[in-house]
Amino acid sequence: GGLHFIGLDTMVPGRPHGELDDAQLDWLAATLAHCTGQPVMIFMHHPPLTSGMAAMDACGLLRGRERLAELVRAHGGVQLIAAGYMHRGIVGALGGAPVVVAPSCSHQLALDLRPQGGLAVQMEPPQVGLYRWTPQDGLACHFSHVQAYPGPFPV
């Protein structure tokens, strides 16, 4: 057993927010049981964390976060929960596992941490999240711009 990849569908047709329903969480519990004692990465669109960006949190993962945290904690081998949706690079945790929200490969959203903050596009450079995991070293996450820039220049 090497590293196991698990994808979860958080999309709700016709709605901006995400959910994890009981059927999907039951499936995840059974899948994690097959991976007992083995490293796992979970991938999903809506991140299972509160970012502090009020407008995005209001339409984020609105159902299933608590049970997901319980399943992740019980398994103990989840190396990463990777997500997107927020159009910003964000790092947090859930159930003892790191949550990494990749930045957007198009536009970013303005960082607005006011309690009643709104949504605004910020024309920051597009980026991607790259994940590297080895049994010896564990996880490293890199955010990389996808546009060409001068360099590299030796230091």
Residue ranges and their predicted role:
Residues L71, G92-V155:
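Binuclear metal-dependent phosphoesterase catalytic core
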